[in-house]
C-alpha cells in the first residue's frame, strides 16, 4: 500500500468532545511495496530470477479507524505515587504525547510503513547464503530404467561432502527502483500523519484539561453560591424572630439553600468524572490522586488575517504534507507498474568445495547472468497500471478535498475565536451586573422594603451569570487551541495560544 487518505471527521458539538468539531484526522500512509526475494539455488547453476513481468503490489489507500475512543484512551505507565500530584497543563500534554492510545497506534503504523520500505529495498539488494552438506547415497539403477550388461545394478554407497556459498544480485530492475521510491514517499507520508496525530492529541488533552479546569471553577462557584444562600437563610431567620418578615421568607430561603446544596453535589460529581477522563487520556496510573496546578486565565488570541492563516495552515499542516506525499507515492507506483514492461538483469553464482570427504574436496563454482524480458504477461501488467492510475486519481482527489477542508477549518476556527471573545466580554459584564443586582436586592430586603423573593431571584441570576462566564471562557480557550490545530501548530505553539505571548 502506497497511498494515504485524509479523513475529515465531523462531530456534533457537545460537552464531552467539543474539540472534535472540525478535527482533520490525517490517515497513515502505509507502504506495502517490495519485491519477492530471489530464490537461492542449490548446488549447480542458479535458479532463474523472478520474471520481470511479476506485478508489483498495487498502491492503495488506507483509512484507519477514526474513533474518538483512541483520543480518550491511554496506556497507564508507572505506579501510583503517594499524596496528591500537582498536574500542570504542560505536564499533562507531555504525558499525553507519551501515553495516549492514538499516538501509540499511529507510531505503530509508522513503524509498519518503515518495515514496508525495507521490504521494497530488499528486492534490490544482493542475497548471500551459505550451506554445508554431507550425504551418503546408495542407488538402484534398475529402478530408474538403467540396465547395462556387465554393469552392477546397485551402485554405492558413496559419500558427497559439499560446502558452498550462493550469491544472487539484481543488477538492473527499473520497476523495483520505482517501487522503492514510492515506498520512501509512503514512509514520509506516514511520518507526517504521525505528527498530525500528535497535534490532535495535544488538542484532545488540552481540551480535557480545560474541561476539568472549568468544572473546578463550577465547583468553586457552587460553593460560593451555597455560602450566599446560607447567609441569606440566617438573615431571614433573624428577621423572622424579630417579627419583620413572615415564615414564607424563611421557607423560601431554605428552598434556595437546598437547591444550592444539590447543585454543589452535581458539580462535584461532574468534576470528579472529568478528572478521571483526563487521567485516562494521559495514561495516569489508576487511582492516582492529582490536582490541577495551572489555571488557564483569559489571554487575547493571536491576531492574524484569514489569508495569513490559510497560507500558514497549508505550509504547516502535517496531514496536508502527508496527502501530497501520498500523491507522489501514487505517481511513483504508476511508474513502477509501467516499468514492469522493461527488461531486468540478474547475476547469480556459487562457489564451494565438493568431494568424497573433507580432505579430498576440490573447489567448483558456477556463474550465470540472466536477462528477463517480459513478452506476454497475461494482462497482469496492464491490470497493475489500471489499478495504479485509479489510486493516483483517488490520492489527488483526496489531497484537493483536504485543501478545501483546511480552508473551511481555518475560517471556522477564526470565526469561533472571534465569537467566543465577544461572549467572554458579554459574560463578564453580565456577571458584574448580576452581582450588583444581588447586592441591591439584599439591601432592599434588609431595609424591609420587600420580601426576599427578589434576593432569591438575584442569587439565581448570579448562578446563571457565573455559569455563562465559565462556559464562555472555556469556549474561548477551546477555540484558540482549535485554531492552533487548524494551523498545524498545536504541539509547537499551544502555550502561546493559551497563555499568551511571553
Predicted feature residues:
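A small-residue-enriched
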Residues: 44-69, 74, 94-172, 193, ...
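Acidic, low-complexity, intrinsically disordered peripheral segments
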Residues: 9, 13-22, 41-58, 138, ...
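Sec/SRP-type N-terminal targeting helices
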Residues: 104-105, 121-122, 157-160, 171-198, ...
Amino acid at each position: 500500500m502506497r497511498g494515504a487518505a485524509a479523513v475529515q471527521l465531523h462531530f456534533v458539538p457537545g460537552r464531552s468532545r467539543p474539540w472534535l468539531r472540525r478535527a482533520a484526522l490525517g490517515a497513515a500512509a502505509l507502504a506495502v511495496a517490495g519485491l519477492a526475494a530471489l530464490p537461492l539455488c542449490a548446488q549447480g547453476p542458479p535458479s532463474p530470477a523472478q520474471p520481470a513481468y511479476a506485478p508489483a503490489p498495487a498502491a492503495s489507500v488506507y483509512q484507519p479507524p477514526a474513533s474518538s475512543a483512541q483520543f480518550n484512551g491511554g496506556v497507564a505507565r508507572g505506579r501510583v505515587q503517594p499524596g496528591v500530584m500537582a498536574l500542570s497543563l504542560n505536564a499533562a500534554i507531555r504525558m499525553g504525547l507519551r501515553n495516549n492510545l492514538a499516538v501509540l497506534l499511529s507510531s505503530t503504523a509508522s513503524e509498519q510503513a518503515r518495515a514496508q520500505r525495507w521490504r521494497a529495498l530488499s528486492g534490490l539488494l544482493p542475497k548471500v547464503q551459505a550451506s554445508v552438506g554431507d550425504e551418503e547415497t546408495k542407488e538402484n539403477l534398475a529402478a530408474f530404467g538403467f540396465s547395462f550388461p556387465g554393469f552392477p545394478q546397485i551402485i554405492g554407497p558413496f559419500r558427497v561432502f559439499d560446502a558452498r556459498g550462493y550469491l544472487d544480485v539484481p543488477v538492473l530492475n527499473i520497476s523495483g527502483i520505482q517501487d522503492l521510491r514510492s515506498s520512501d514517499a509512503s514512509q514520509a507520508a506516514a511520518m507526517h500523519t504521525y505528527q498530525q496525530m500528535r497535534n490532535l492529541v495535544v488538542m484532545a488533552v488540552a481540551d480535557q484539561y480545560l474541561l476539568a479546569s472549568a468544572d473546578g471553577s463550577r465547583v468553586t462557584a457552587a460553593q460560593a453560591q451555597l455560602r450566599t444562600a446560607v447567609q441569606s437563610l440566617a438573615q431571614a431567620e433573624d428577621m423572622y424572630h424579630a417579627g419583620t418578615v413572615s415564615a414564607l421568607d424563611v421557607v423560601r430561603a431554605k428552598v434556595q439553600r437546598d437547591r444550592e446544596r444539590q447543585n454543589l453535589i452535581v458539580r462535584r460529581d461532574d468534576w470528579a468524572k472529568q478528572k478521571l477522563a483526563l487521567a485516562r487520556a494521559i495514561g495516569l496510573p489508576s487511582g492516582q490522586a492529582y490536582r490541577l496546578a495551572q489555571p488557564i486565565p483569559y489571554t487575547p488570541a493571536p491576531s492574524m488575517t484569514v489569508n495569513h492563516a490559510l497560507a500558514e495552515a497549508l505550509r504547516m499542516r502535517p496531514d496536508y504534507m502527508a496527502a501530497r506525499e501520498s500523491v507522489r507515492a501514487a505517481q511513483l507506483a504508476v511508474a513502477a507498474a509501467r516499468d514492469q514492461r522493461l527488461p531486468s538483469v540478474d547475476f547469480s553464482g556459487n562457489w564451494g568445495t565438493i568431494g568424497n570427504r573433507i580432505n579430498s574436496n576440490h573447489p567448483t563454482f558456477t556463474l550465470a547472468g540472466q536477462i528477463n524480458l517480459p513478452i506476454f504477461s497475461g494482462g497482469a501488467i496492464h491490470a497493475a497500471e489500471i489499478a495504479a492510475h485509479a489510486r493516483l486519481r483517488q490520492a489527488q482527489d483526496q489531497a484537493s478535498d483536504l485543501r478545501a477542508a483546511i480552508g473551511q477549518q481555518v475560517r471556522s476556527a477564526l470565526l469561533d475565536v472571534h465569537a467566543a471573545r465577544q461572549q467572554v466580554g458579554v459574560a463578564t459584564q453580565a456577571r458584574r451586573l448580576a452581582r450588583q443586582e444581588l447586592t441591591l436586592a439584599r439591601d432592599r430586603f434588609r431595609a424591609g422594603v420587600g420580601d426576599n423573593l427578589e434576593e432569591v431571584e438575584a442569587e439565581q441570576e448570579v448562578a446563571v451569570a457565573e455559569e455563562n462566564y465559565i462556559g464562555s471562557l472555556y469556549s474561548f480557550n477551546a477555540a484558540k487551541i482549535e485554531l492552533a490545530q487548524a494551523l498545524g501548530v498545536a504541539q509547537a505553539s499551544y502555550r502561546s495560544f493559551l497563555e499568551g505571548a511571553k
